[in-house]
């Protein structure tokens, strides 16, 4: 099959950043300059192409990652045509999961920084996620025209807070309302974009005299960075004291792809300056599917396997997102790592053990779609007609099975009870919630056994608000929502050895299960760990999985207030059995009895979710804000100055943060903003724990 673009001319990139850094506007400009979109979509008009759900247009924030394909030949039309698949990811912390799934399937990313706000909490989160997946990235310092814009301050924050190695390949010409263009340090030219053509035309001039010395200094640093890529480049540099443009690009590209440096660019997407040069940098420095390591997985025998990027290899893809489209139904977004697939082909989903037929294949441009017949290695596309697929599943050739690594999804930290307003809504609500849970793995639905209520859980208040809103808009279900509840956890603080016995022997076939367990605290965040220490067959092999199952089932219900138990290590080290009466169920029950007993004796404690809270407030309100955070059991961890504002970093229990935005608005005349994200679980103080336990 001949492709319009060879694989080395593919770029799968994400645009990621903190909320309000200008990420969606940047993505919009990419679509405009690559010729896909003929009218610029502005976020504050509610018309941005990438933000396609109604809630996104109303709130002016991006919730779901829209995937778009576009083509670019360079700002001056001097590159062969490249195909860029862009994924716009949300910056609001409640939707971190969307960022996580996008990064899993991307080869590179552009991180957008606000020139005034710099490195903000969500920037740190997405940066950590990108580190986890080893995604090479560029830094685009946006909003250079804003009051307080400071390119070099963002560079310093990237070093101090992100531990990154930023290498400026551009410098701004002027700043704030004097921002006029950029200095391209690779070519040593000043670049100015034409306002009348909305930035589609540009001209190169000599660098302004006042900035020539500065440009020479930073160019020297950039060339040193490029030369470190290889011995050959270093020798060229040492001999000539300079490097040719192609050598600079080659060196910077190699080091970017190895995650050793982050090329830094600048501009203002809103004023149509700099995004065009950023697109050129995507071609120059970010990897193609050929530059990234082969994707790893396991074959049907559980042995390690991998697939390199080749159309001749068997088909393997990862489903990274599910969305419901009002016209075509459920769309499964997937990234192809090897091989090709046509509409009508049958694929195998090893996670579910199911074969499915692909109906139609669509290439997405935000919420417009183009039907295609075939997709190949490196492509990101959407399929219609796959019923059983959930996020993170593998799709592969039925004759060459591979299961790609699944994604890790965070546990929800907040839950609310929802009740349908009418009997008619009852059934529809179940369908709606299950569909939404299938789309979003960080959203969970369960029924409370005691009250019979439907409980929905998610990553924050906004996350659940949007779920309820979507239920109403997309499924026509009206629901009453209870007050948000914190997802507490239980853990133990000391080691105990405990016996569990389940015996029923009254004539006929009886029940006999007997175990000795050692329970001890596990490292924070490690979860539940089961260790089999049985020697000499005290508990027969075939019953050991039943013991583990009995323990896992018991974890969901702690002894203090019925919250799930975390971070516990349990070893099965002894027990006994009966030739006739022992069975799996008896050992499951014995394990469960021992667990309940052991929990009571192992100094159980209540854990509460702690949030990293960052408040940006005008300096005059700092005292009020700090006092209020302290009254919420907050621990102030640091402060920073930005012109006219103070940034306060703190850690506060989630339970104390409900309704905080309203309080903060009134305490600062609406001028402060804050962001909050889950940090870790921590032991609740005695008085707090007692109050929670007494309510249960």
From Swiss-Prot:
Give the superkingdom in one word: Bacteria
GO biological process terms held by the UniProt record: ribosome disassembly
Q: Which GO terms describe its molecular function?
A: GTP binding; GTPase activity; guanosine tetraphosphate binding; translation elongation factor activity
tr-type G domain mapped to chain residues = 8-290
Enumerate the subcellular locations listed in this protein's record, separating them with semicolons.
Cytoplasm
Keywords per UniProt: Cytoplasm, Elongation factor, GTP-binding, Nucleotide-binding, Protein biosynthesis
Q: Which GO terms describe its cellular component?
A: cytoplasm
Q: Which SUPFAM superfamilies match?
A: EF-G C-terminal domain-like (SSF54980), P-loop containing nucleoside triphosphate hydrolases (SSF52540), Ribosomal protein S5 domain 2-like (SSF54211), Translation proteins (SSF50447)
The residues listed in the UniProt record as binding GTP, with positions renumbered to this chain, are 17-24, 88-92, 142-145
Q: What is the protein's major site of localization?
A: cytoplasm
- Signal peptide start-end: none
SMART domains associated with the record = EFG_C, EFG_IV
Q: Which Pfam families match?
A: EFG_C, EFG_III, EFG_IV, GTP_EFTU, GTP_EFTU_D2
Task: Name the protein family.
Answer: Belongs to the TRAFAC class translation factor GTPase superfamily. Classic translation factor GTPase family. EF-G/EF-2 subfamily.
* Annotated function: Catalyzes the GTP-dependent ribosomal translocation step during translation elongation. During this step, the ribosome changes from the pre-translocational (PRE) to the post-translocational (POST) state as the newly formed A-site-bound peptidyl-tRNA and P-site-bound deacylated tRNA move to the P and E sites, respectively. Catalyzes the coordinated movement of the two tRNA molecules, the mRNA and conformational changes in the ribosome.
Q: What is this protein called?
A: Elongation factor G
The encoding gene: fusA
